[in-house]
Amino acid sequence: MTFAKTGFDKAEFKKNVISNCKTLYRKNFEEADKQQQFQAVAYAVKDIIIDKWIATQKEYAKQDAKTVYYMSMEFLMGRALGNNMINLTVYDEIKEVLDELGVDINVIEDQEPDAALGNGGLGRLAACFLDSLATLEYPAYGCGIRYKYGMFKQEIRDGYQVEVPDNWLKDGNPFEIKRSEYATVVKFGGYVRSYRDEKTGRDMFVQEDYRAVTAIPYDVPVVGYGVNTVNSLRIWDAEPVDTFNLSLFDKGDYQKAVEEENLAKNIVEVLYPNDNHYAGKELRLKQQYFFVSASVQRAVAQYKERHDDVRKLYEKVTFQLNDTHPTVAVAELMRILMDEEGLEWDEAW
């Protein structure tokens, strides 16, 4: 897939950086602190990406291209600003603009925290796959969790290592876009009630007495190197279906009033929670099912926006499972195809 390449306008970029600083912080660029300057630069780089991102999705839709959904518990993406400037092939030009503004590009890059979405080789492998897929211009989504703290960061206190939360989102992520229109409900627990459909004669299954959370996707651009293709890393945040129980709060049951909110928050707090106890094992399984269910539901819904026959899903959608964590996707896809789309077992399989 080939797109027409566009030039880089240094004067326009400089203007956008200065304007971003005023809009975001009510400050002139030279008056802003380093973190604020980073945000202003990052949003200006994002502006370059956006048109390519939109054009990529339009081209994929036009070609009705088969899409791969790469599911992984972690993505070790690194810092986005420098990587995006390099892949857009505008690093040197932006360095010149920042020199004119009196700031060192390396200092600006250092203001960005590492995205706490991955930890080791598994996450780095996933990130490399996404980079390669975008550079080779294959239609692809990365699918994972938008962890609030990731794992931890290390501090040395009195000569000892201390693990503290890595609050990487405290200043926001300038490259992500919240996609509330694609919010998806994920159900946990309860029981399955079966009944026979009088019209079709089929046995039907309904999940009841479950607890639900709302999965909210955030899209992060994955810029291909030297091309105009921009794919997406879609990471899911968890929010309660019912945010706040005012009735319980008014009765003084404050903990119960926010119980559903805490249930949702726990799912996305950290990568690989301690599973030396039952609660930790349960939380890990919830995390795995949470992002897998949301991703598969969205993939099927996106397919149905352009196609009527769900039996031909395999022609346009493929799922790549990174390690064992997302393998519950097999069972979840079968559930969706059978219980929601009405296929028989052999058809779904």
Language-model features: locations:
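A conserved ligand/cofactor-binding region detector
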Residues: 1-349
